[in-house]
């Protein structure tokens, strides 16, 4: 399995990653936003935390739902396909955003998405990755405010949108 990843992760990654991790992850109320995913035990840097699962569907079939803040679509394949966790999804759909994440989402060549630990994660710590949302319209303060970030990190961008 070829893994495309940033230099923030170790060169050798744990490629054995289950679709569900009740032994490792707990979904519960988050101080950041609604529900969140928390580590039931410590996780080492480079470990695969979970696969982000759901039905792979064309972006065009869900574009009208994308503005609904309760959606959990994960865009893949150059924005033409999304993973819809409403069908066949798992606890990964509850992972919240942070501008200072402890995990990173990695898309495989086959369109599967895995969440890897960027650093050691302590038992009880909430799991985060940077959503880095992309928009088709020009980036303005109004557009950024439509996807506000509440992560509270020292380096918070104030938006879920990708850094410019």
Give, region by region, the residue ranges found by the protein language model.
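Catalytic cores of histone-lysine modification enzymes
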Residues: 5, 10-106
């Amino acid at each position: 399995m070829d893994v495309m990843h940033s230099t923030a992760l170790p060169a050798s990654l744990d490629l054995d990653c289950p679709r569900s991790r009740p032994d490792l992850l707990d979904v519960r109320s988050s101080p950041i936003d609604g529900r969140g995913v928390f580590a039931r035990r410590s996780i080492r840097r480079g470990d695969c935390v979970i696969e982000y699962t759901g039905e792979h569907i064309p972006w065009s079939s869900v574009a009208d739902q994308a503005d609904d803040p309760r959606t959990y679509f994960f865009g893949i394949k150059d924005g033409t396909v999304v993973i819809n966790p409403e069908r066949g999804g798992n606890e990964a759909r509850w992972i919240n955003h942070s501008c200072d994440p402890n995990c990173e989402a990695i898309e495989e060549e086959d369109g599967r998405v895995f969440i890897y630990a960027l650093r050691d994660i302590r038992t009880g710590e909430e799991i985060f990755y940077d959503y880095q949302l992309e928009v088709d319209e020009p980036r303005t303060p109004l557009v950024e405010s439509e996807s506000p970030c509440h992560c509270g990190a020292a380096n918070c961008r104030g938006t879920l949108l990708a850094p410019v």
